[in-house]
């Protein structure tokens, strides 16, 4: 019941117990109280009996005291949605945190929504071209699909996400929503300023911006980190339903969503499951992931960075995420150590739509040929390490030479990484990617040195670089 009043009876970190006199608020209702002169939102998680509810705080609870008055809002957390949120940074409860004044939205939506029903969903499969060779060729993204970027710490997940926002926001006229979940505040700040520089956010006229940002970073309490992905998703759903276009929804990092859930789970008195995660891990993940889908109105394509604890893909958090994905882009430390960026593992990454019926026979065949050569090279590496290259047959030597060229050709300079590489980013059209790799596999460029294939765009750049290298050597 809206406006029912209660009192705080117990505070344990991010978990607050509230006792009501008569009407109990429903599960997932938002309650409000004041703490240090600021509005503090609590979300009901459990009914404990004796008219007491256990809630999760969406902000710090330092300074909150027993006996503080709490009001039931009568519904779930609601956030502003629509064009007014473009170019803005919001927090989990929809308040602006960018010091640009209030968000003058005409509509608000509850962050907890049911997933679209079967008859509302769309079933077509189309490729979403990113301009990044290794992704478009070997693990293509589908429109309205869910894509996971897997990788340990520091192998380039956030850089790849920023490049995708950069490429797709420019090529696509659609909107993007970026949810920063439990990641570094510095990265969130960098991303915001880079978006201003690249005109994705237009400060003079915010409503012409292409992106809305929702942040719940590492320093936030677990309640905020466990809900901020839902806040971002609610914004994306409204853009999809209102504009009927492809909306891009970026989550960095989906692991932190699970981690925040596990932090509050023990405080809520649940018995932990494998590796200390919450027993409701699969349920929490499913409730969010099932909302990310294509409907008849439009699509939400979601790209989610997945931190892999200790590089262990069998950990319950990444393993549960795998089940929901249409494509996986696995970033490998071994490849980043070779200096090949993006450090995408061409053999571990996969996509549901790498299928001749979706991408076409030629694309499928070239991708499989490239993977075949790289797989053969991988299996020969032990022999090379022990006996050296000279012990290989002529055919294997040729395979190794081509594989090393392919490996380098899968690297690419990024716009957003210009400060590291010193060279301008390139986007390669899908047709060029397919024809270039087809020619390399067929041996048409066996005469070029492997260094010419490193950090370039299309095959024309390889030829130009090889000529430059020959001129310098002479």
From Swiss-Prot:
GO CC annotation, single: plasma membrane
InterPro entries hit by this protein? AAA+_ATPase, ATP-synt_VA_C, ATP_synth_F1_bsu, ATPase_a/bsu_AS, ATPase_alpha/beta_chains, ATPase_F1/V1/A1_a/bsu_N, ATPase_F1/V1/A1_a/bsu_N_sf, ATPase_F1/V1/A1_a/bsu_nucl-bd
Binding of ATP occurs at 151-158
State the reactions this protein catalyses: ATP + H2O + 4 H(+)(in) = ADP + phosphate + 5 H(+)(out)
Where in or outside the cell is it found?
Cell inner membrane
Q: Which domain of life is it from?
A: Bacteria
Give an example GO molecular function. ATP binding
- Matching HAMAP family, A to Z? ATP_synth_beta_bact
Q: Provide the family line.
A: Belongs to the ATPase alpha/beta chains family.
**What do we know about how this protein assembles, alone or with others?**
F-type ATPases have 2 components, CF(1) - the catalytic core - and CF(0) - the membrane proton channel. CF(1) has five subunits: alpha(3), beta(3), gamma(1), delta(1), epsilon(1). CF(0) has three main subunits: a(1), b(2) and c(9-12). The alpha and beta chains form an alternating ring which encloses part of the gamma chain. CF(1) is attached to CF(0) by a central stalk formed by the gamma and epsilon chains, while a peripheral stalk is formed by the delta and b chains.
**Protein name, as recorded:** ATP synthase subunit beta
UniProt lists the gene as atpD
């Amino acid at each position: 019941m809206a406006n029912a009043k209660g009192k705080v009876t117990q505070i344990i970190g991010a978990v607050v117990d509230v006792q009501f006199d008569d009407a109990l608020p429903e599960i997932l209702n938002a309650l409000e109280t004041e703490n240090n002169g600021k509005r503090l939102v609590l979300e009901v998680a459990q009914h404990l009996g004796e008219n007491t509810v256990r809630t999760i705080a969406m902000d710090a609870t330092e300074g909150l005291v027993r006996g503080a008055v709490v009001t039931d809002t009568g519904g779930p957390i609601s956030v502003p949605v629509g064009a007014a949120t473009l170019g803005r940074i919001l927090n989990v409860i929809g308040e602006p945190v960018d010091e640009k004044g209030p968000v003058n939205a005409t509509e608000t939506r509850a962050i907890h929504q049911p997933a679209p029903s079967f008859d509302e969903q769309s079933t077509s499969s189309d490729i979403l071209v990113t301009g990044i060779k290794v992704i478009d060729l070997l693990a293509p993204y589908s429109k309205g699909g869910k894509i996971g970027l897997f990788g340990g710490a520091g192998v380039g997940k956030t850089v790849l996400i920023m490049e995708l926002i950069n490429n797709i926001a420019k090529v696509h006229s659609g909107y993007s929503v970026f949810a920063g979940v439990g990641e570094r505040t510095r990265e969130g700040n960098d991303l915001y300023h880079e978006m201003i520089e690249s005109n994705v956010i237009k400060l003079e006229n915010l409503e012409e911006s292409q992106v809305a940002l929702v942040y719940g970073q590492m320093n936030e309490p677990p309640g905020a980190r466990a809900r901020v992905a839902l806040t971002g998703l609610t914004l994306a759903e409204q853009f999809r339903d209102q504009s009927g276009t492809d909306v891009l929804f970026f989550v960095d990092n989906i692991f932190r969503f699970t981690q925040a859930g596990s932090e509050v789970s023990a405080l809520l008195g649940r018995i932990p499951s494998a590796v200390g995660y919450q027993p409701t891990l699969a349920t929490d993940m499913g409730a969010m992931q099932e909302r990310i889908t294509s409907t008849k109105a439009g699509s939400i394509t979601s790209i989610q960075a997945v931190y892999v604890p200790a590089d262990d893909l069998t950990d319950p958090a990444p393993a549960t995420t795998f089940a929901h994905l249409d494509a996986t882009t696995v970033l490998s430390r071994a490849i980043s150590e070779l200096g090949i960026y993006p450090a995408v593992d061409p053999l571990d990454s996969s996509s549901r739509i790498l299928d001749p019926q979706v991408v076409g026979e030629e694309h499928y065949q070239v991708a499989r040929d490239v993977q075949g050569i790289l797989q053969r090279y991988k299996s020969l590496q032990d022999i090379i390490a022990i006996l050296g290259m000279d012990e290989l047959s002529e055919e294997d030597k040729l395979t190794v030479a081509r594989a090393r060229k392919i490996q380098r050709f899968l690297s690419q300079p990024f716009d957003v990484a210009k400060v590291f590489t010193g060279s301008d980013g390139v986007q390669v059209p899908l047709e060029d990617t397919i024809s270039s790799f087809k020619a390399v596999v067929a041996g048409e460029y066996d005469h070029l040195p492997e260094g010419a294939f490193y950090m370039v765009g299309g095959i024309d750049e390889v030829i130009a670089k090889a000529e430059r290298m020959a001129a310098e050597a002479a």
